[in-house]
Amino acid sequence: MKFRGLIAGTLFSTLILIGSCQKPLSTHVDTRSQTRPSGLPEFHQRGGLPNFFQKVKEGRDVKVAYFGGSITEAGDGWRSMTFNWLRINYPHTPFTEINATIGGTGSNLGVFRMDHDILEQKPDLVFVEFAVNDFGRSSHQINQSMEGIIRKIWKANPNTDICFVYTLAENVLQEIQDGHYQATAQTMEKIADKYQIPSIHMGVEVARLAKEGKLVFTGKPEENPGKIVFTTDKTHPLSKSGHPIYASVVRKYLTEMEEMIGEKPHGLPTPLIADNWETSQLISLSELPPSAHWQKLPADHEVVKAFSKSMPSIYQPTTPNAILRIKFKGTTLGFYDVIGPKSGILEVTLDGVKKEVQRFDQFCHYYRRSSYFLDGLSDSVHEVTVRVPRTGFDKAAILQKRNIKIDDPSRYAENGWYLSNLLLVGNLLSLQWD
């Protein structure tokens, strides 16, 4: 089953077979060993997935959660390929998929939303994929959220297994080819070591193929005949030629871990960092009394219809200068919101210091879930006021950064805010709107 001399055409055919979910008897993409020629390991087994495979072998109902950003969210991507492989490879086990992905978001939002999006559904295995979207965050910030994710999962159920999976974008390709994980994955590896969580770097194989000249990382398939084209945008794998590589790597190491079985509850050791976000809370606004200046969006509103599964309630100000006042004791306050054509500017005052926050960017020609944080605060009492002035600004100039033109000005006429929840590490002391 170990293919060493695959030419590009044969390799491409292999990828198509995986993507079409055929019985996985000959669907390897030359993932020869745990360590690539550069000496960079793509897999660390550590404690494996014993509880997951115990249930699989017994044919019991098994729930698999995929937790990450747009790379994992992709409809015809590694998520669906690996989940379909599980169903085919273990036909006597009923599998349920939990798709807990949100494009463009990292582990800093994930740790807050996971109670609703994952834990309420009682998963048996959670794949965690945030290496690309956590780019730019400090090691300490990644530790806070990623360690919080682990500890929340095991507090909810110590028999839930976790597997870290790492992806890559073009900006870290050379680093991986030089034999080093990107900084985000290096930080996550230290956490995985601490908690003995298995990890799979799907990007190591991609980097190897690119270095050997078999793969073009970013390009157009029609301009690169005879080669695998991984992506057209430097990040998101193509469903026919990029995602199957990711899927084949994960499949290989799931197979390698399947003999390590048994009911082995995971204990919680002393945390790596004391200020990790295991106490993070997603706070609902539904308990607030009615306000003349705020309203809950109706069920038929376009934003509610798009995001009701993860955001059951979404609120917006109805008058200019509507205000939200929050008092809390803690280190972090965030806002889980939706940004898009009708979103605008916020005036945020933290402990008397005022700042303008723009909830509109060059991608806001469509609506998407997002978040904004006030973090790194002292663990003390803080007061925050958010005012929504609804003043206009040049949205066309912002969209022009991506060569997007406003063809219907009415879609962008409002300058409001779509708020779903507060995100808090600490204790809420008071909350009101007026």
Where are these regions (language model features)?
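Mobile, glycine- and charge-enriched loop segments
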Residues: 74-108
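Oxyanion-hole/transition-state-stabilizing segment in secreted/luminal serine hydrolases
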Residues: 65, 77-80, 93, 107-143
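N-terminal secretory targeting modules
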Residues: 1-67, 72, 77, 87-93, ...
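Solvent-exposed loop/turn segments at secondary-structure junctions
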Residues: 70-73, 102-108, 132-137, 160, ...
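Extracellular serine-dependent O-acyl
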Residues: 161-166, 182-228, 244-257
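Alpha-helical scaffolding within the catalytic cores
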Residues: 44-53, 83, 107-120, 143-152, ...
